[in-house]
Amino acid sequence: MTRRIVRTISQLGALLVTALLFVFLVDTRYRLLPHAIHTQNFLHHPGLIVTDVTLTTCSSLNPLSSCQLDSSKWHRIEKDLYLHTGWVSSAYLHVQRKREEELTADDKVVVDLRVGRLDPGVGEKGQQQEQWESRPGNIWLLRSNKKKDSDSDRAVTAVDVLFGADAVDPRPGWSITQTPLLLDAASRLQAARITIRHGPVRAEKKDVVPRIRKDGKFKIIQLSDLHLSTGTGSCRDAIDANGDIKGNCEADPRTLDFVGRILDEEAPDLVVLGGDQVNGDTAPDAQSAIFKFADLLISRSIPYAAIFGNHDDEGPKATRLSREAQMSLLSTMPFSLSRPGPDNIDGVGNYYVEVLAQSPSQNSAITLYFLDSHSYSPDEKTYRGYDWIKPNQIQWFTETAQSLKTQHAKYTHIHLDMAFIHIPLPEFAMQGNLVAGGEFREPSTAPGFNSGFYKVLKEQGIVSVGCGHDHVNDYCALTPQSKDAANTENVGPWMCYAGGSGFGGYAGYGGFHRRVRVWDLDMNAGRIVTWKRVECCGDDLKKRIGELLIVDGGRVVVPPESG
């Protein structure tokens, strides 16, 4: 009797498994299962599926032309494909989308998109059996009415537009077309390229946790003033080994090649983007510029944290991307530690990053503070030049630093605190500063108003503050009282310029080669050594330029002599 029951249960179980398997197989084609079950199945990605793509052009001379389609059916990507450079013409990409559960038997989903003059079904190997559909701008769509395709990684689920011959898309699951859209001669300078995402939205990026290496070391590279453009950009003040101005060159490829080489040679644990990553006036699509430096870091799996300079959000109102929008984009990118910070204080990008001790410890070993130094003076008549760190930022910093001290005391070695801003503090411009490890080539363009932030940094135990902005300065400095200080506990913090990294920004001043600043931290000794790496030339390519010990045993080190 017992055997019969067991046999019956086994047979029913096998039948149930077979039935479920059959239902799931049929569902891949005919969608039998309810949406609630689909959402639990990793093969499904509920959300918007692209069913069509088209391009519209319009002319301000023709009142009957329009770049708007029926908004109940089409979503317009809000980027003029001419980047507002067309005298009378505009063009926009439109995408038709449906939710997966709303697809009918008559709907087709886009599974591939190409751009080219020839039908991929005729000109490409392996595509002869496919029925490609043409759209304006030399767009070709491959669409499918098979239900299983809407549930697979074949389905196109998002479309975007980037610009420039050097455009890249580092977002997971996205791929960019190699051929630009065919518009007309007016758009050739900044070619518009479609980029698409196949399959579901990838899992939200996991927070990157920077950590001290097993040997107790941690290395930071500070990139300042990259001045990247939409498209390749034009070099400014590019010189050769003899100091002679070189001919025309493309700024961004040269900048990225230089930075990529240093990243590979120095192998940093973290990159600080010190502001003016984007050269607003030559970057009508800031997203394309941002993706170029992000790709450089994401492809190498290097965590990075960014602040803004005065040029990042410049440019014509029609095309410029606000600080808020840029930070929103950056904060979602892989390996990014960038954050907008509290929305009740001035600026965008006031935040801190904790670098943890060696695994498995969860204690902080280093705290890096990032603050928005804003842009131009809000009171040009009284204080000419640039803006300053605001009182509510200083209050936020002070309260944050004090709140972390108890937790930091749990670290078994010496905890170190550093800060990064873009525009130098007024103390950078003080007469009689003790200058070391670099050159003072141009006057400091610090704010005319001193809000007292340097004093607060000192009170809270910050050992160094790095800045950019003045491209051809690359020195470190201590305030004048450091020269005669009897107690080094009252000295500092060090103020260090990074030096300009990008060929899209100015240089000159008697011959200046682009550079980056390296911060090498040895937590076993509470020590920081810093130097620069340069883009040119000869033996200097491998040298540590202006190497300087600035902190030892957790205390600021005063060098024996300046220079």
Residue ranges and their predicted role:
Residues K217-T230, A365-D379, F420, P493-G500:
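Active-site-proximal beta-strand elements of phosphoester/diester hydrolases
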Residues P180-I212, K292-S403, Q407, V516-V518:
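Extended active-site neighborhood of metal-dependent phosphoesterases/phosphodiesterases
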Residues E266-D269, S361, T367-F370, K381-P480:
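His/acidic metal-ligating clusters that form di-metal
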Residues M1-D244, C536-G553, V558, S562-G563:
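Acidic, histidine-bearing metal-coordination/catalytic regions of metal-dependent phosphoesterases
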Residues D225, V259, V271, D276, ...:
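Divalent metal-coordination and catalytic microenvironments
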Residues H227-T232, N279-T282, A306-A318, S377-D379, ...:
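Active-site environment of divalent metal-dependent phosphoester hydrolases
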Residues H227-R254, V278-D285, K381-Y386, A436-E442, ...:
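Acidic/histidine-rich helix-loop elements
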